[in-house]
Amino acid sequence: MKIKNKSLSDKSRKWLKRHVEDEYVKKSSKENYRSRAAYKLMEILQKYSALKNSRVIMDLGSAPGSWCEVLNRNIHTEKYILAVDLLKMKPIKGVEFINCDFNDDQFIEFANQKKPFDLILSDISPNLSGYKNADHLRSREILENTLDIALKYLENGGHFVSKYFRTGDISDILSTCKKNFDKVSSFKPTSSRKESSEIYLICLNKKNIDS
């Protein structure tokens, strides 16, 4: 496919061409998902089937909503889904959405009302600059913040899944995860672009370390 818009830079033109020709972009359109990211969560749920037993779920960085759609289609029993994003998200049946930052009082109020959660998900991506050190710090900060939320609001036995980027050392964060969860691993779905450094941290069965 040729991209003829002359106002686009070569870089933008290449990105657009790759996007419209992407297998998962086409598939998401055909299967009525809001974005290709849906297939990443499908693969995660398939590999880590215990996640499908979740009933009270938090989706951080939820917009445009494809992960909520996957949860609705793959978890068939009664459930509650709280979706959180700074970006607006069109309504999804069965999903409660709050348009705020997870440091806002509105989020804290909702989370405290609905806790404990048995699954907390994050597909948040930082605004990458192309500078490795800066991008690592941004990615690391997001991972630290989402892990803090998981440790605060997950029930014992609950699970945490978060995107991060392999741009630097996070061994201290992994140590915290291993201290607080029975099983900790990393997983890169086949639907994640090969050239992307993104990968997902999978933390299963939060420990009752206070007992």
What spans do the regions from the language model cover?
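A generic alpha-to-beta junction signature in SAM-dependent methyltransferases
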Residues: L51, I75-H76, Y153-L154
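Conserved SAM-binding loop of SAM-dependent methyltransferases across substrates and taxa
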Residues: P64-H76
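Class I S-adenosyl-L-methionine
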Residues: D10, R166-S211
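Mobile active-site "lid"/loop adjacent to the S-adenosyl-L-methionine
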Residues: F102, K115-G157, V161, R166-S171
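Glycine-centered, small-residue-biased loops immediately flanking beta-strands
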Residues: R55, K79, G158
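Conserved class I S-adenosyl-L-methionine
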Residues: N53-A63
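Class I SAM-dependent methyltransferase Rossmann-like catalytic core
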Residues: M1-N53
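S-adenosyl-L-methionine
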Residues: V84-S129
